[in-house]
Regions:
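Short coil/turn linking the two alpha-helices of tandem helical-hairpin repeats
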Residues: 144-151, 193, 219-228, 560
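Long, intrinsically disordered, low-complexity segments
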Residues: 95, 177, 238-248, 253-255, ...
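An aromatic- and glycine-enriched ligand-binding surface/loop that stacks and positions planar moieties
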Residues: 6-10, 14-67, 207, 218-483, ...
Length: 751
């Protein structure tokens, strides 16, 4: 696939008949796999699909608050979404140019114009047609997820059209087309066991089509109740965009005869395939050490967006740039990591945002659910950048000893040292520490010691400020208490040669700082071409088996078969459990609330897990009964009033735990119909709700963690606005520009 990508990029200079030859058409079809890359190249993708979720907050306050200055037809979100589509782009990047190529391939094969093997080998032609149908379906699906009803071209063009009469096709019509195309693809794509993984890795398979179909059938069932006039939907499935509830009506996808059964059927085709299996260790899915790409061959992965090694000619201009938008900062000489290191994330100058409090709180039992530790950098060890070159990746080197003259870390104060020696040292046996006493004026951190770590606690479990300051590393906690005062995400600050906490300020909410909370591990790229570079060669998982299980679980639950749903849910949760012999992060074993339930041995270096936590992770129906402690811990929105409501929200919680900072979660949340409710009740910066959160004492002129929402979110923000530049381009069938009333009718409600 990589070599073909290179050849395809030369297509614009070829004669148009070339794409009816065997070689030309094959290159054209390979090029349509760019559909999977569109959202991974620039800021548009992560900014579009990480704004509008409930477990992540945009770092720019106006965007995170859903300010009308950003959410309008001329604002950033309209322009980002428009750039992903590419219908009036200056380049050939974007979904519409890809659909154009898909349509060309589809018509060439269907009309019998394709030559060579396409004309003589019916099976080969059907497989190739299926790939083009699959990639067109993916492109249309993502755009419909952004906008609802969209223009879907059926032909292709090699020149400017005579008009821009881009009529929006109803969502029921779109889903009927997608399902029909993907059912054809399912029948004609090869099974993964038949695929040449060395030559065709990354190409669509029968399993990918089945997973996609399961998702589409479930989404159609999820939105069936919105297909009425109350939500602006007419008998043909078209939506009146002047209706205030049209943000729900636009989710309506029609009604099949047995959509839930179809979801179960196609999900089962993947689950029972025999090839696909859950990775035994969740962390292995994202573990990407130096010169090790083995995680990309996991049998849990059904479809990935593939890249070659960094610098490959077939990676496009920058390759996968998600590390640049999701990475976390950590370089600080004062805690023993003086510069960016190869084995830690790259410099993230364009980070789009942060997991919010709800996103961390979803991991209810962090000592049992390994996904918290394996999804986030919860602690860092002191380190120096390895190697002698800025462009040759190398393993991190040990930082200086605590008593080395080159050590530049914070020093112990007398108060810190006294508390540490009396209350912490007697039970602190980290190997690198070697039992040393804290001495005022000596450096805190040295070789192999922790540099800094995070505690994601609650106001009720706030850590005392003396204990926090006396840790043998810099502790960054969500809640710290000082007597009767409670501080929310209080930032540390230098104080002489040591540090303290600045109780006159706060982090989080509208003041997210670069180290205020744990960053994701899912996009770390130690094999980058420069130690601060943004280009990556990592593959990006799009369909994986854990999601397939949860799709089927929701379908079972909606049919009332909770026992079958629980079996599928527990497959995913059992995998997530810490197993005996694994190692917990020190901060989890010593400080994160819940550590006190671990055995004494588990609270000691090397923090090895003694007790398998699988049984602790398994769920039953009490998790959505509305009254039990298990149910309340899931933090369902107040609008989830029935058993089915809570069950569906449990599935969304489980997807959020699995897919944190993976853009796939946006799709699940959006199509569920719960997107607006969950943002309002879960994302404090976005929410206009009052009194849902705890309040703190470290405010700035009355602003900060007051317990109130800080946002202006409106439910119609669940669909993106069409960009004004695109609306101004539209015409009727005669090429006459649309008037303002027609543009208003075309635009989604509220914009």
């Amino acid at each position: 696939l990589h070599t073909a990508y290179r050849r395809q990029r030369q297509m614009c200079i070829r004669d148009r008949d070339y794409f009816e030859t065997e070689q030309g058409l094959e290159q054209l079809i390979v090029g349509t796999y760019d559909a999977l890359r569109v959202t991974k190249q620039y800021e548009q993708g992560p900014s579009t699909f990480m704004s509008g979720v409930d477990n992540f907050t945009n770092k720019t306050p106006n965007r995170g608050m859903y300010s009308p200055s950003e959410w309008n037809a001329t604002g950033r979100f309209a322009n980002w979404a428009n750039s992903l589509c590419g219908e009036n782009s200056k380049s050939l990047l974007g979904f519409y140019p890809i659909i154009n190529n898909c349509n060309r391939a589809i018509l060439s094969i269907r009309e019998g114009k394709a030559l060579g093997k396409f004309a003589t080998d019916a099976e080969y032609a059907a497989r190739s047609l299926s790939e083009a149908l699959f990639n067109r379906a993916y492109s249309v699906y993502i755009m419909s997820t952004m906008y609802g009803a969209i223009y879907v071209p059926q032909g292709y063009t090699t020149e400017l059209p005579s008009n821009y009469n881009y009529m929006r096709q109803s969502v029921p019509g779109i889903y009927s087309m997608l399902i029909g195309d993907l059912r054809y693809a399912y029948d004609h794509l090869p099974d993964v066991s038949e695929q040449n993984l060395s030559a065709d890795f990354g190409r669509a398979t029968k399993g990918a089509a089945a997973h996609f179909l399961a998702k589409l059938y479930l989404q159609r069932a999820q939105a069936e109740k919105f297909g009425t006039a109350e939500y602006g939907v007419d008998v043909n499935g078209n939506v009146d965009t002047s209706n205030p509830k049209s943000y729900l009506g636009m989710l309506y996808k029609g009604k099949g005869t047995a959509d839930l059964d179809s979801c179960i059927y196609y999900a089962s085709a993947v689950i029972d395939n025999g090839y696909y299996e859950l990775e035994s260790d969740f962390g292995k899915l994202f573990s990407h050490p130096l010169n090790d790409y083995s995680n990309e061959n996991s049998r849990e992965l059904i479809l990935s967006c593939v890249y070659g090694p960094v610098g490959s000619a077939d990676n496009g201009r920058f390759g996968n740039r998600l590390p640049y938008f999701f990475g976390g900062d950590y370089a600080n000489a004062s805690w023993g990591i003086p510069e960016f290191c190869w084995e830690y994330p790259t410099k993230s100058a364009s980070r789009v945002g942060y997991t919010n409090d709800f996103g961390f709180d979803l991991y209810v039992n962090k000592q049992a659910d390994s996904r918290y530790q394996k999804s986030f950098h919860v602690e860092y060890v002191t380190a120096l950048r390895g190697g002698d070159s800025n462009s040759s990746p190398a393993a991190n080197k040990d930082y200086y000893a605590y008593n080395n003259s080159s050590n530049a870390t914070y020093e112990w104060t007398a108060e810190m040292a006294d508390y540490f020696n009396e209350h912490i040292l007697p039970g602190y046996n980290r190997a690198s520490w070697r039992g040393r006493q804290a001495v005022a004026g000596e450096h805190k951190m040295g070789t192999g010691d922790l540099a800094f770590a995070y505690v994601e606690n609650t106001k009720e479990t706030a850590i005392d400020i003396k204990e926090a300051l006396a840790q043998p590393f810099v502790l960054i906690a969500r809640w710290i208490k000082d007597g009767s005062k409670y501080y929310y995400r209080v930032p540390y600050q230098a104080s002489g040669k040591s540090y303290t906490y600045n109780d006159k300020s706060y982090g989080g909410l509208d003041k997210f700082g670069s180290t205020v909370c744990p960053a994701t591990v899912k996009y770390d790229e130690p094999n980058r071409s420069n130690y601060t570079h943004y280009e990556s060669g990592r593959d990006v998982p799009l369909f994986r088996l854990a999601e397939t299980y949860l799709l089927r679980a929701e379908a079972y639950g909606r049919k009332g078969n909770y026992n079958a749903a629980i079996d599928d849910i527990n497959k995913v949760r059992a995998r997530a459990a810490f197993k005996a012999g694994e190692t917990r992060a020190e901060v989890l074993a010593r400080l994160q609330p819940g550590y006190e339930k671990l055995t004494q041995a588990e609270q000691q270096w090397p923090y090895e897990v003694e007790k398998d936590m699988t049984s602790t992770m398994l769920v039953d129906e009490s998790y959505w009964d509305g009254g039990s402690a298990n149910s309340k811990a899931e933090m369902y929105p107040e609008t989830a009033t029935t058993t089915e409501d809570r069950f569906v929200n449990f599935i969304l919680n489980e997807l959020a735990r699995e897919l944190n900072q993976e853009m796939v979660y946006y799709e699940n949340l959006h199509h569920s119909g719960w997107q607006a409710d969950r943002i309002i009740y879960h994302d404090q910066l976005a929410s206009p709700k009052q009194g849902l959160w705890d309040n703190s004492d470290n405010l700035i002129n009355g602003i900060g963690q007051t317990g109130n929402g800080m946002g202006m979110f409106e439910p119609y923000f669940t669909f993106k606005p069409f960009a004004q530049t695109m609306l101004d381009l539209l015409t009727d069938e005669n090429g006459v520009l649309l008037d303002e009333a027609a543009k208003k009718a075309y635009q989604n409600y509220g914009y």
